[in-house]
Structure formats: structure tokens, C-alpha cells
């Protein structure tokens, strides 16, 4: 049977891509963030996942405000990146596996998640940059990917509890796949930040650290809060942490933390990184 071997979650702000292009990884501003990936690179080299399930949000490349699904799953054999206007070079297509995607889609429908199915899907920086951070030396991403897009842009947004249940369902589906593939879960976005309005620049360090701590022993902790309460605590864009919640929920059983990094600010955002593996 298929096996989930671990989870990585990371921030995905576009300025990360600019820092990579400009070779700023060792600069005073960026080094604390990029250095957090060194133990993750070693872990990936040792464990070699075959498939990565990516929980992310779209910022207008594939979906826009006039058509924004709550949950969408890619069901293609490749996914393309495109210019978003950030000055970040587009990346080569990412490998998919439509058969794996359809197993997940069918399983979610059976569990009463009404997902949008995308047989042609563009993926933006929220998907591409985290994968580039994981495999920085690879010209093309070396793993099969399955994009699972969660709406964090157009209200109403799915609750943290709903996203937890989504991730849990995905984990159950993977565990029942008749396959010897090794799966890793990737959650992207956050942590606390707000890009506009009266609270532009808002960061809540205490909540971020409490949230990071909860991922190991109490992964449902943040589900006590409504979306409106999360916006108050982490900012309008900080609600991207619901992707982390979904990713964590996909991990079965007990987990242990291999590494965790928290660095502020990266482009007015609280930067977070975590690697958990099953015990």
C-alpha cells in the first residue's frame, strides 16, 4: 500500500523567488529563512518521496474572483507555470499523474467533498516556489505532484475545521491506494501577514509560534477559530495557514518534528518552515 512519509509546510511569498533569482539566499535578510531548508534537503535525499500532494492557494493565475472554487484538485499529467507579473522566471512544467489524482478526487467525492476537477491547470508561486525551495538544484521538479487548491481569496472561505477534514480524507485515501509509492504532503502559505488595509504589515508572533507548536501534538488546535477570528489573529492573508492545517491532517498517527524555523519579516510576512515525519 502507499505510504505517507512526512509533511513540509513553508511560506510562499513571491519575494522568495526574487531572492533566488538574485542569489540573495546568504544575505543577512534572507539567510535565516533559506538556512531552515538545509535539514529538509538532507531528509529528502534520505527518504526520496515519489509523490508530493500540494495544498496551496491560487492568486489569480488559474482562478479569479468571478470563478473561485472552495476546493479544486488537479487531474492532469503535467501542470504549467506562467508569468504572474512578479518578475520571477516561469518554471518548467511539473509532473502529474492523472490516475493518482482521480483516485483522490473519487475518494473525496465519496466522502462528500464537492471538489472542482481541473484536467488543465496553471499553478502559481504558491505551488512552484515551495517545490523549488525543496529541490533548489533540480532544473525540473523531480517528483510527481498533485495540486489541491484551497480558496483563501474570495469569501466565504472554508473553515479551518473543514480544511482539517479535507486533509484527513486525503490521507485516508492515500493510505488505501494499491501502490508502493512514497507520498509527502506539502502545505504552503502564511504565516501571519496582512498586505493591505489599516492593518497592513500586521504580524502576530505569539499566535504563529503557538500554531507551530500545535502541529505536533494538537493539530486540531487552530480549528477552534472561525475564519473571521483567524483573520483577526493572523491577518487577511495569514489565513493561508489553513493549508498547513490540511497538510498536517493528512499525516496518520503520531508524528515527530525534524525541524522548524520562524523568521520575521520576509516581505512583511512571518516566514515559517516545518518538517514533520511519522513515527
Residue ranges and their predicted role:
Residues 1-50, 62-165, 176, 198-279:
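Flexible, D/E/H-enriched segments
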Residues 13, 58-60, 191-192:
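Catalytic metal-binding/acid-base residues of hydrolase active sites
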Residues 50-56, 148, 181-189:
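Beta-strand elements within well-structured catalytic alpha/beta cores of enzymes
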Residues 168-175, 181-208:
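A contiguous pocket-lining binding segment that forms or flanks enzyme active sites
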Amino acid at each position: 500500500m502507499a505510504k505517507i512519509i512526512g509533511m513540509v509546510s513553508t511560506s510562499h511569498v513571491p519575494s522568495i523567488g526574487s531572492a533566488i533569482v538574485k542569489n540573495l539566499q546568504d544575505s543577512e535578510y534572507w539567510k535565516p529563512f533559506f538556512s531552515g531548508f538545509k535539514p529538509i534537503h538532507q531528509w529528502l535525499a534520505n527518504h526520496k518521496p515519489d509523490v508530493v500532494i500540494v495544498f496551496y492557494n491560487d492568486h489569480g493565475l488559474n482562478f479569479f474572483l468571478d470563478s473561485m472554487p472552495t476546493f479544486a484538485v488537479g487531474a492532469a499529467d503535467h501542470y504549467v507555470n506562467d508569468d504572474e507579473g512578479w518578475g520571477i522566471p516561469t518554471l518548467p512544467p511539473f509532473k502529474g499523474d492523472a490516475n493518482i489524482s482521480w483516485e483522490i478526487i473519487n475518494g473525496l467525492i465519496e466522502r462528500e467533498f464537492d471538489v472542482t476537477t481541473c484536467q488543465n491547470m496553471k499553478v502559481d508561486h504558491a505551488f512552484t516556489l515551495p517545490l523549488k525551495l525543496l529541490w533548489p538544484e533540480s532544473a525540473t521538479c523531480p517528483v510527481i505532484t498533485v495540486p489541491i487548491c484551497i480558496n483563501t481569496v474570495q469569501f466565504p472561505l472554508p473553515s479551518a475545521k473543514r480544511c482539517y477534514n479535507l486533509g484527513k480524507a486525503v490521507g485516508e485515501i492515500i493510505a488505501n491506494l494499491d501502490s508502493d509509492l512514497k507520498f509527502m504532503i506539502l502545505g504552503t502559505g502564511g504565516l501571519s501577514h496582512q498586505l493591505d488595509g489599516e492593518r497592513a504589515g500586521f504580524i502576530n508572533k505569539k499566535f504563529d509560534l503557538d500554531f507551530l507548536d500545535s502541529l505536533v501534538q494538537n493539530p486540531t488546535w487552530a480549528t477552534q477559530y472561525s475564519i473571521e477570528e483567524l483573520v483577526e489573529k493572523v491577518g487577511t492573508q495569514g489565513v493561508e495557514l489553513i493549508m498547513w492545517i490540511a497538510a498536517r491532517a493528512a499525516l496518520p498517527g503520531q508524528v515527530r518534528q525534524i525541524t522548524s524555523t520562524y523568521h520575521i519579516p520576509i516581505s512583511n510576512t512571518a516566514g515559517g518552515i516545518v518538517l514533520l515525519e511519522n513515527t
